[in-house]
Amino acid sequence: MVADHGGAVLIASPKVAASLSTKPVWIAGAGESMGHSNMLEMSDFTATSAANSARDAYSMAGMGPDDMEMALIYDSFTITAAMTAEMLGLAPRGEGHTLWKDGHAAPGGKFPINTNGGGLSRF
């Protein structure tokens, strides 16, 4: 994985969250997966292990991509964002780029993605 910056998510108990001045976001599910340790081991360069992570998170949450309103996804390269959107079930395989091309991923679009600009905006 290419990494050039960091991020943080602060997780608190329901009791602490209730004492905060902002409305909390509840974590309904999580998933993590690694498909290979180096690119030479990849059998399919059009797929990522995000599909496995998504499957696990959706199962834990009892939800699916149609239940989400927006997403923040890893975007080390432009193609990474499009492929990850496909692996998360947000677009059919080979069609992830259309979320951006057609404006659906933009703030105010049908399914906003990386409304903070994503990692690529930090260069």
Region spans (language model):
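Condensing-enzyme catalytic core mediating Claisen C-C bond formation in acyl metabolism
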Residues: 1-52, 56, 60, 104-122
